[in-house]
């Protein structure tokens, strides 16, 4: 929770920067309109999580008698990565977009409590994390600031999760759902222009290399550059 709070504070700080710089960089012009396309890309981060412990047991002659062989504890490091998206404006307030995320978190498995008193050992491997996503966005034009150049938005959608590990020999798949809030800060004027894009929110993942069948909620933040055309 402490990591989530730090990420939230960082996101709020980032959101305030465009308002401070607005007078220097905005030169006017209309906001995105129906038929506009928006291409975006940049970096992202989600914190790691603990996947819990599993004890390997040996069943003896009767089902009620078990013998603990060892215990394994698994955890995943943070998810620093990159994203790309392409969106289409259905109207001035509504757009849809498809995108792709890529990250390489580290999966750590610690073996302890060996029945034969072997020393504890930790094995690390890097996982290739791919996410193909689709979202719908509601652009809050009435809440724009910085002379209209900064337009907040809400976003929600789902994705297909694909994760490779064991030297990319094993493939795990799953689902992802997200609810985000962000801001587009457009630079200059005209139908073709660049902008800055920041957003944060919650991502719920299911399966992948995570053995838990329930949804796992994680905070996530994004920051990057957009191009309107």
Region spans (language model):
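Residue-level signature of outer-membrane beta-barrel architecture
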Residues: 45, 88, 138-140, 183-187, ...
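Transmembrane beta-barrel strands of outer-membrane/channel proteins
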Residues: 39-47, 98-102, 154-160, 183, ...
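Gram-negative (and chloroplast) outer-membrane scaffold detector with strong preference
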Residues: 24-30, 85-168, 174-176, 188-190
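Outer-membrane beta-barrel "beta-signal"
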Residues: 38, 136-137, 216-229
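Flexible, surface-exposed loop regions and adjacent strand-edge segments
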Residues: 55-62, 112-119, 170-174, 212-218
């Amino acid at each position: 929770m402490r990591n989530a709070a730090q990420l939230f504070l960082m996101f709020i700080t980032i959101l305030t920067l465009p308002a401070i710089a607005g007078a220097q960089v905005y030169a006017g012009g209309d906001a995105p309109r129906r038929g506009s396309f928006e291409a975006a890309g940049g970096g992202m981060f989600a914190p790691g999580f603990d996947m819990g412990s599993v004890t390997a047991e040996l069943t003896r002659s009767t089902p009620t008698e078990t013998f603990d062989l060892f215990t394994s504890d698994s955890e995943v490091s943070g998810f620093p990565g990159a994203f790309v998206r392409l969106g289409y404006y259905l109207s001035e307030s509504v757009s849809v977009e498809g995108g792709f995320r890529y990250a390489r978190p580290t999966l750590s498995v610690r073996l302890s409590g060996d029945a034969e008193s072997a020393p504890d050992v930790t094995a690390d491997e890097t996982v290739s994390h791919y996410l193909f996503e689709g979202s719908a966005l509601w652009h809050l034009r009435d809440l724009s600031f910085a002379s209209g150049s900064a337009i907040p938005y809400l976003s929600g959608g789902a994705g297909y999760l694909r994760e490779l590990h064991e030297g990319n020999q094993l493939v795990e798949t799953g689902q992802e759902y997200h609810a985000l809030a962000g801001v587009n800060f457009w630079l200059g004027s005209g139908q073709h222009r660049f902008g800055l894009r920041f957003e944060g929110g919650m991502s719920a993942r299911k399966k992948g290399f995570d053995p838990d069948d329930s949804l796992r909620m994680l905070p996530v933040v994004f920051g990057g550059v957009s191009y309107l055309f």
